[in-house]
Amino acid sequence: MDDHKTASPPRERSYETPPAERPITDAEAARAAALSANEHIKIASGYLRGTLADGLLKHATGAISDDDGQLVKFHGMYLQDDRDLRAERTKKKLEKAYSFMIRLRIAGGVVSPKQWLALDEIARTYANGTLRATTRQTFQYHGVIKSNLKRTMQAIDAVLLDTIAACGDVNRNVMAATNPAQTGAHKAAYQLAKTISDTLLPKTNAWREIWLDGERVVGGEDEAVEPIYGKTYLPRKFKIVVAVPPSNEVDIFAHDLGFIAILDKKNKLKGWNVTVGGGMGMTHGETDTFPRTADVMAFCEPEDALKVAEAVMTVQRDWGNRKSRKNARLKYTIERYGLAAFRAEVERRVGRKLQDPKPFRFESNGDRYGWVEGEDGRHHLTLYLPSGRIKDVEGGPRYLSGLRRIAEVHQGDFRLTGNQNVIVANVPADRKSEIDALVAEYGLNLGVTALRRNSLACVALPTCGLALAESERFMPGLLTELEESLAAHGLQDEDITIRMTGCPNGCARPYIAEIGFVGRGPERYNLYLGAAFDGSRLSKLYAEDVAAKDIRATLDPLFAAYARDRQPGERFGDFVIRAGFVAKTINGPDFHDRTGALKAVA
């Protein structure tokens, strides 16, 4: 891949003047300014309390109020229902089969064996019997009913974990590089992620009051209760990652804020390149919404990284769009006011000028499977988890039971990756054989083909309320079909990134996959092609509203052309652009421009 050295050259255009005031926190003023409904909910919430405590006591329903449904996200939960059962329950005049998805906050994705065992027990006791590793280095539970919410949260708290700010208009879970070979750099990345996570955590006591029956803390001025966020928190979600080249397994260009480790020849940290303005979500048919890859804005010294993180987030707090949530992410803020103005304001808040970015190079955004020895002599085993779902498969791998057994004997830690996989980390050399025996006994090393190890899928149906099509449940069968097609053209060992989401919000980051599927409706998908293998370039729409049954037939001629006409070492995403099947996407606003994407497959 090309070296990434500087921010994208600015397009010649005029930008708006940034606002000079802090966000509106008065209810009357918010109404007069026509702020979004969520802003009113936050203002009236009493720092994220709302009526959640009372709603939990209403046993006649498995749901909570609509306003509390927005606030509970800040506590790490989404209200969902089983969409497979909707029609049947409606016919019987029953309430929807409500339950909650619970997402943990695990900075850097590191958990101890003790914590793993506790999380496993929670899954089997209160959730649907599975754990799900997410695309952002944490766990989700599905199927937790309202009456079990407090018990679940208290069990999570008992092993020194929580779900605070795992969702909502706040800084979300902070990701960090997991590359096990670069032990020192990984430690620096993890420490920065953990420090940022702790510093930017909401300070309201609402989570402990509601879920742990803690004593209510009397509120005061905004600066006392929430010194960073204030009463209205952020305009929208905010995601931070820390990467260590040459691996981009955290997909740094897909996030609001990123730190890229700049290392010397001895792999010692010199500082961080700072990226801003990435994000995946969009809305079908609305071209003023788009995914965007982050700009490489500047370089900062190690001691300034935390100040930069807080400055970037608070500029977004003050400048972000609070009228239209679809245009509220940092990517739109930078498009609206310009990168130069944004950097200048960040520097003003940091109190010093930042340096220009340093050269760096990413080579891939996938995981390194199997055993890897770190610089410190410890060993790390990366295991593939299909779509991140940790469960026992009948007649196949027993992920839940096998990882439970490993946790019972493991003396190191576990690391979740941004690709929905898990690393059994920090294993002494003399304990490798014990881990290998358990991996073999439970079949945990089965089915890791080239295509599967580069695949991601969101949960989608039946639990996600936003899903327009299947994803996790459909992906395995589709991969089998596409593997057959690739093998027919001698491409079975080619690494090609492939991702699927059930809606355009892009949780599995499909717009930076070489092959991306985005749900349009039941069994129908938009097909995107042409992203960079290292995650640094967006894809382009190749075919719209493709029936699920036609996906293989649509891609097979492209695989044939790739096998026949590719250049040495050429990646699939680069090939489809050079061959003229799709136009190259420069960045976000260019995403919807399909000019040049009209070549028919020979």
Curated annotation (Swiss-Prot):
GO terms for molecular function: 4 iron, 4 sulfur cluster binding; heme binding; metal ion binding; NADP binding; sulfite reductase (ferredoxin) activity; sulfite reductase (NADPH) activity. It is an enzyme of class 1 (oxidoreductase). It comes from the Bacteria. Residues 1-15 have a biased composition (Basic and acidic residues). Binds 1 siroheme per subunit. Binds 1 [4Fe-4S] cluster per subunit. Siroheme binds at C507. InterPro entries: CysI, NiRdtase/SiRdtase_haem-b_fer, Nit/Sulf_reduc_fer-like_dom_sf, NO2/SO3_Rdtase_4Fe4S_dom, NO2/SO3_Rdtase_4Fe4S_prot, NO2/SO3_Rdtase_4Fe4S_sf, NO2/SO3_Rdtase_FeS/sirohaem_BS. This is Sulfite reductase [NADPH] hemoprotein beta-component.
